[in-house]
């Protein structure tokens, strides 16, 4: 009977000893909850991207600005998954909404005959970009923000726009813009 009990307990003891000898466990997070810190980092990344496009234009002209803008768009927006709900500040008529990567690129750097009114918002001589959030909503792997973005140019002039973004967190942790609405504040 004692021998039988020992045989029942021995595998449990061996299992316990085996677990103690293992390295740290592999952890898999099964939710994609986006955090406020990730959203703010994505907004700061967007501002940094805009300033990089502006600096690229100043130092290397249109070709360098376009290549930089392509990288910024590919990193920050979710066009690779389908249409993005993008309404730029200075767009109107049939070209108000930019569901495609090409439409976003034209807005940021201009130079696309399919978008003749675009002069390149991001190639202006921007020196700073700052986000002020009024609302941040976090919902699983998505987040919405609403507030203002202020841009300062080389002459020190500040332009402030009303900005609404929606962000998506991919399974690998990458945060991408799926909605971007920008407009000038009402003056009345």
What are these regions (language model features)?
Residues 23-79:
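Short, low-complexity N-terminal intrinsically disordered segments enriched in polar/charged residues
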């Amino acid at each position: 009977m004692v021998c039988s009990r020992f045989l029942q307990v021995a595998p449990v003891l061996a299992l316990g000893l085996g677990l103690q000898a293992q390295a740290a466990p592999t952890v898999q997070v099964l939710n994609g909850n986006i955090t406020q810190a990730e959203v703010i980092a994505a907004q700061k990344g967007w501002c940094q991207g805009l300033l990089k496009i502006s600096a690229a234009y100043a130092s290397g002209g249109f070709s360098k600005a376009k290549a930089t803008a392509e990288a910024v768009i590919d990193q920050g927006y979710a066009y690779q998954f389908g249409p993005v709900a993008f309404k730029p500040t200075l767009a109107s008529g049939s070209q108000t909404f930019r569901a495609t990567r090409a439409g976003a690129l034209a807005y940021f750097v201009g130079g696309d005959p399919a978008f003749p009114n675009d002069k390149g918002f991001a190639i202006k001589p921007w020196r700073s970009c700052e986000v002020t959030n009024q609302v941040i909503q976090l919902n699983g792997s998505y987040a919405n923000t609403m507030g203002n973005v202020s841009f300062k140019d080389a002459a020190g002039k500040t332009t402030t726009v009303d900005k609404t973004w929606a962000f998506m967190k991919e399974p690998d942790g990458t945060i991408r813009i799926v909605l971007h609405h920008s407009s000038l504040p009402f003056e009345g």
